[in-house]
Amino acid sequence: MQRSILAATALILTLTAPAPTHADPVPVGLDAYAQWDRWPQQRIGVRAYMRSTYDRDGGNRTADASHFLYAERPDFNVALDILGRGVLYFVRTNHWHGSPWHYEIDGTDNLVRETSTVDPERPVRNSTFEPATTFPPPLAWTWSTTRGADLNWVPIPFDRSLRLAYGRTFYGTGYYIYHQFAEGTPISTPLVPFDLTKPPDAKVLDLISRAGTDIAPQDIARHDTKATLTPGEPTTLFDHSAAATIRALKLTIPRDHARELSDARLRVTWDDRPSPSIDAPLALFFGAGLLHNRD
């Protein structure tokens, strides 16, 4: 069965774009957000890690909660312990569990709370992180907005070490993402240890607040195509043979076929390479499980 849609299951791009070199400074900290045009670039010398409170026995005991590395005292239960310089970019906890949290940077303890900490049995509506000016939306959201987790994307730089410890252990879950850097890797700004009194740059907050809006330039070349997809057969939507940068990829599909087209594969190939550099289900490419909009 054929369907006429503004979409494609395969894109073939012959694209020659300037490649980053080792001398290009790696955007770090808030620069990693502000320099959004460099998000797709491969970053040489960056080591990305994810850690959590998972059950080290592999059994998912207590739903991967409260598996701390060690405890120094009743209110200092260490879930993350890093040596060397780097940036902690993401922390997720179930609700406010574990608060107050100790962000120990280069040996200096910084205490971070959530407003439901005072009386955990009676959580606060419209809760926030404390200090609120240091952890504002949209870089930090609490369970009252997310309906399940406290999420923190405020970059936490450290020069020598970082430890994250929980003040309470009840259902102390946690997931953490951080970057470290190989010796000699140039970075965009010195890694000044995190300052609990310093709020994030307002320009970064404004940029992240515009997520989901169209921030692509309006005065650039466009290529519009209407394609008819045949199940099981690739369709070429765009083929370009000169140096260029793709600034936006927009697909419009029929609402009544959104679910089935979620699994259509999107393939993108640069410079006539034998294998595509992108080969993913359409929904996954756009960061969704399904293209179906329940609203």
Where are the regions a protein language model picked out?
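Sec/Tat signal peptide C-region and signal peptidase I cleavage site
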Residues: 19-22
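Beta-strand-centric surfaces of beta-sandwich/beta-rich domains
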Residues: 24-295
